[in-house]
Design a protein with these regions (language model features):
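Catalytic metal-binding core of the metallo-beta-lactamase
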Residues: 1-117
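Bilayer-spanning, highly hydrophobic alpha-helical transmembrane segments
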Residues: 99-145
Length: 145
Protein backbone atom coordinates (compact mmCIF):
# COMPACT_ATOMS: atom_id res chain seq x y z
CA UNK A 1 0.00 0.00 0.00
CA UNK A 2 1.41 3.37 -1.00
CA UNK A 3 1.56 6.45 1.17
CA UNK A 4 -1.52 8.62 1.40
CA UNK A 5 -1.06 12.28 0.44
CA UNK A 6 -1.45 13.23 4.12
CA UNK A 7 1.34 10.83 5.11
CA UNK A 8 3.61 12.17 2.38
CA UNK A 9 2.87 15.72 3.49
CA UNK A 10 4.03 14.97 7.04
CA UNK A 11 6.99 12.91 5.83
CA UNK A 12 8.36 15.61 3.52
CA UNK A 13 7.61 18.38 6.03
CA UNK A 14 9.76 16.66 8.64
CA UNK A 15 12.61 16.02 6.21
CA UNK A 16 12.46 19.64 5.02
CA UNK A 17 12.59 20.96 8.59
CA UNK A 18 15.59 18.83 9.48
CA UNK A 19 17.55 19.60 6.32
CA UNK A 20 16.75 23.32 6.75
CA UNK A 21 18.02 23.09 10.35
CA UNK A 22 21.39 21.88 9.10
CA UNK A 23 21.02 18.12 9.35
CA UNK A 24 22.51 16.15 6.49
CA UNK A 25 20.04 13.94 4.66
CA UNK A 26 21.45 10.84 6.35
CA UNK A 27 21.24 12.37 9.80
CA UNK A 28 17.70 13.56 9.09
CA UNK A 29 16.71 10.06 8.00
CA UNK A 30 18.29 8.47 11.06
CA UNK A 31 16.63 10.99 13.38
CA UNK A 32 13.27 10.25 11.78
CA UNK A 33 13.86 6.52 12.22
CA UNK A 34 14.12 7.15 15.97
CA UNK A 35 10.48 8.28 15.94
CA UNK A 36 7.39 6.15 15.42
CA UNK A 37 7.06 6.12 11.67
CA UNK A 38 4.72 3.89 9.69
CA UNK A 39 6.55 0.77 8.54
CA UNK A 40 6.54 1.83 4.88
CA UNK A 41 8.19 5.18 5.68
CA UNK A 42 10.76 3.53 7.92
CA UNK A 43 11.58 1.04 5.15
CA UNK A 44 11.97 3.91 2.68
CA UNK A 45 14.39 5.72 4.99
CA UNK A 46 16.39 2.55 5.62
CA UNK A 47 16.62 1.91 1.87
CA UNK A 48 17.69 5.53 1.34
CA UNK A 49 20.41 5.18 3.97
CA UNK A 50 21.63 1.93 2.42
CA UNK A 51 21.66 3.53 -1.04
CA UNK A 52 23.63 6.52 0.21
CA UNK A 53 26.04 4.16 1.95
CA UNK A 54 26.54 2.39 -1.39
CA UNK A 55 27.49 5.68 -3.03
CA UNK A 56 24.23 6.48 -4.81
CA UNK A 57 22.90 10.00 -5.14
CA UNK A 58 20.03 11.13 -2.93
CA UNK A 59 17.67 10.93 -5.90
CA UNK A 60 18.76 7.39 -6.76
CA UNK A 61 18.57 6.31 -3.12
CA UNK A 62 15.07 7.75 -2.70
CA UNK A 63 13.88 6.59 -6.10
CA UNK A 64 14.76 2.94 -5.59
CA UNK A 65 11.21 2.20 -4.39
CA UNK A 66 8.90 2.79 -7.36
CA UNK A 67 5.82 1.96 -5.32
CA UNK A 68 6.38 4.70 -2.74
CA UNK A 69 8.07 7.49 -4.71
CA UNK A 70 6.57 8.85 -7.92
CA UNK A 71 8.42 10.26 -10.91
CA UNK A 72 7.37 13.78 -9.86
CA UNK A 73 8.97 13.30 -6.45
CA UNK A 74 12.16 11.91 -7.97
CA UNK A 75 12.48 14.86 -10.31
CA UNK A 76 11.88 17.48 -7.64
CA UNK A 77 14.34 15.80 -5.28
CA UNK A 78 16.83 15.56 -8.15
CA UNK A 79 16.44 19.25 -8.96
CA UNK A 80 16.95 20.15 -5.30
CA UNK A 81 20.00 17.92 -5.10
CA UNK A 82 21.59 19.35 -8.25
CA UNK A 83 20.82 22.92 -7.18
CA UNK A 84 22.01 22.41 -3.61
CA UNK A 85 18.58 23.35 -2.26
CA UNK A 86 17.18 20.14 -0.82
CA UNK A 87 15.17 21.76 1.98
CA UNK A 88 13.05 23.89 -0.42
CA UNK A 89 12.61 20.86 -2.70
CA UNK A 90 11.28 18.77 0.17
CA UNK A 91 9.10 21.69 1.30
CA UNK A 92 7.64 21.98 -2.21
CA UNK A 93 6.76 18.29 -2.08
CA UNK A 94 5.24 18.73 1.38
CA UNK A 95 3.15 21.67 0.15
CA UNK A 96 2.00 19.76 -2.92
CA UNK A 97 0.92 16.70 -0.95
CA UNK A 98 -0.67 18.91 1.71
CA UNK A 99 -2.81 20.58 -0.96
CA UNK A 100 -3.66 17.21 -2.48
CA UNK A 101 -4.69 15.79 0.91
CA UNK A 102 -6.81 18.86 1.62
CA UNK A 103 -8.51 18.66 -1.77
CA UNK A 104 -9.33 14.98 -1.29
CA UNK A 105 -10.64 15.55 2.22
CA UNK A 106 -12.79 18.48 1.03
CA UNK A 107 -14.16 16.44 -1.88
CA UNK A 108 -15.14 13.57 0.42
CA UNK A 109 -16.74 15.96 2.89
CA UNK A 110 -18.65 17.62 0.07
CA UNK A 111 -20.06 14.25 -0.99
CA UNK A 112 -21.36 13.34 2.48
CA UNK A 113 -24.56 15.41 2.37
CA UNK A 114 -25.65 14.32 -1.14
CA UNK A 115 -25.05 10.68 -0.17
CA UNK A 116 -27.16 11.15 2.97
CA UNK A 117 -29.96 12.66 0.88
CA UNK A 118 -29.76 9.82 -1.63
CA UNK A 119 -30.09 7.17 1.05
CA UNK A 120 -32.82 9.07 2.85
CA UNK A 121 -34.69 9.50 -0.44
CA UNK A 122 -34.49 5.78 -1.14
CA UNK A 123 -35.72 4.99 2.33
CA UNK A 124 -38.62 7.45 2.22
CA UNK A 125 -39.54 6.85 -1.42
CA UNK A 126 -39.43 3.07 -1.54
CA UNK A 127 -39.16 1.36 1.81
CA UNK A 128 -41.59 3.42 3.88
CA UNK A 129 -44.52 3.13 1.43
CA UNK A 130 -43.85 -0.59 1.09
CA UNK A 131 -43.71 -1.09 4.84
CA UNK A 132 -46.81 1.04 5.43
CA UNK A 133 -48.73 -1.05 2.91
CA UNK A 134 -47.75 -4.19 4.83
CA UNK A 135 -45.98 -5.55 1.75
CA UNK A 136 -43.42 -8.27 2.17
CA UNK A 137 -39.78 -7.66 1.35
CA UNK A 138 -39.94 -9.27 -2.11
CA UNK A 139 -42.64 -6.84 -3.25
CA UNK A 140 -40.72 -3.88 -1.83
CA UNK A 141 -37.56 -5.01 -3.63
CA UNK A 142 -39.45 -5.41 -6.92
CA UNK A 143 -40.79 -1.87 -6.62
CA UNK A 144 -37.33 -0.60 -5.84
CA UNK A 145 -35.77 -2.13 -8.93
Amino acid sequence: MAFTPAQKHLFYTEIAKMVEAGFGIREAGRAMLDTRLPARQADLLRAMDAGLEAGKSITEAFGADDRSITELERRIIGAGERGGRLAPAFQHLADYFGMLATARRDALQSMAYPMLLLHLGLFVGVLVPGLMGQSDFIDIAKNFV
